[in-house]
């Protein structure tokens, strides 16, 4: 099901922080409900960049163990990932879970993947993994 985010709501969401949005949802639902939240420290790689707002484009990554599949399967899966991420019809954010957490070693977000995803029109990325060479 496709959802649309009108400009007025988009602008409003950009103007508030995440705790404000969570509190508003709890008020609307009439109960406290967000028990599945980050307990660690979040680090913003571009603090002057403003709020990221958009629909989540999700994926999972891993790097601790080498892949065991045939190279053609790996290539097809990667191409499907990039096709999926490139299908942006509105505001979107990449949300990538590193399943190796807390022992992440695959710095997926570096200069190249950052530029590729920006080229797709994504507003930014959220990950529990590692980043490098973003400059």
Protein language model features and the residues they cover:
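General structural feature for long, well-ordered alpha-helical segments within catalytic domains
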Residues: 17-24, 55, 109, 113, ...
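Extracellular/luminal Protease-associated
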Residues: 83-128
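N-terminal low-complexity or amphipathic/hydrophobic leaders
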Residues: 5-80
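Histidine/lysine/aspartate-rich catalytic loop segments that bind and position anionic ligands
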Residues: 132-135
């Amino acid at each position: 099901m496709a959802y649309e985010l009108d400009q007025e709501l988009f602008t409003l969401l950009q103007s508030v922080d995440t705790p404000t949005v969570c509190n508003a949802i709890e008020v609307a639902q009439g109960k406290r409900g967000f028990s599945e939240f980050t307990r660690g420290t979040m680090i913003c790689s571009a603090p002057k960049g403003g709020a990221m707002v958009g629909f989540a484009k999700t994926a999972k990554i891993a790097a601790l163990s080498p892949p065991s599949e045939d190279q053609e399967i790996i290539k097809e899966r990667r191409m499907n990932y990039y096709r999926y991420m490139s299908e942006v019809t509105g505001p979107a954010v990449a949300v990538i879970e590193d399943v190796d957490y807390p022992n992440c070693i695959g710095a997926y977000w570096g200069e190249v993947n950052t530029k590729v995803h920006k080229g797709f029109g994504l507003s930014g990325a959220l990950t529990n993994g590692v980043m490098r060479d973003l400059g």
